[in-house]
A protein has these predicted regions:
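N-terminal pre-domains immediately preceding structured catalytic cores
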Residues: 2-134, 141-184
Length: 184
């Protein structure tokens, strides 16, 4: 957890430093960052068991519990191998859901990112004007967390599809700068 906090702090200083030269530093996609993200995804599985018990979610299902704002800032952890998203407030897991990430030919990037922009309803400029409700962009080339079809395997063009009700709740608690940690 300390290594993850250090990586997030480094990312924050990169964002601050690059703001001066107008180059968004939204991500750490280094090997080390990818390993940190994978560790965070592994820990999230353990935290889910402790927080919610031995629940098995079907595609489109989610769990959400109230956690006081005073617990700390939010962060999103994505496990690509499990096709799951986890939401923390501080060190407390508050939510978990099934997802659909990028297909093999359009993979979701792994590493440590932050939300760059939020749009309640966006339409894809790349994919036939496809709707992207509750879009939270974490990558400058249009990859986002958003409401979309959640099946049993990866099926997106790189985005992270979330169940609609979950995406709406997540959109309501995050802000630009919220960390998005994506591990294998």
């Amino acid at each position: 957890m300390k290594r993850l906090a250090s990586a997030l702090a480094l990312m924050g200083s990169c964002v601050l430093a690059t703001t001066v030269v107008s180059t968004p530093a939204s991500a750490l996609e280094t090997y080390e960052a990818q390993m940190e993200a994978s560790d965070a995804a592994s820990q999230a599985r353990v935290d889910m068991l402790e927080a919610f018990g031995p629940k098995v979610l079907k595609p489109g299902q989610y769990l959400w519990r109230d956690v006081p704002d005073s617990a700390g800032p939010e962060r999103v952890v994505i496990s690509l191998s499990d096709q799951m998203a986890y939401v923390y407030r501080g060190d407390t897991l508050m939510a978990a859901t099934t997802i659909s990430s990028g297909r093999d030919d359009k993979p979701t990037p792994s590493g440590i990112f932050s939300i760059l922009e939020k749009m309640p309803m966006y339409r894809s400029k790349k994919y036939d004007n496809a709707p992207m409700p509750f879009a939270e962009f974490f990558e400058p080339h249009g990859i986002a967390l958003h409401a979309g079809y959640v099946g049993t395997e990866p099926n997106s063009h790189g985005c992270v599809h979330l169940p609609t009700a979950f995406a709406k709740k997540l959109y309501g608690i995050t802000e630009v700068g919220t960390p998005v940690i994506i591990g294998a």
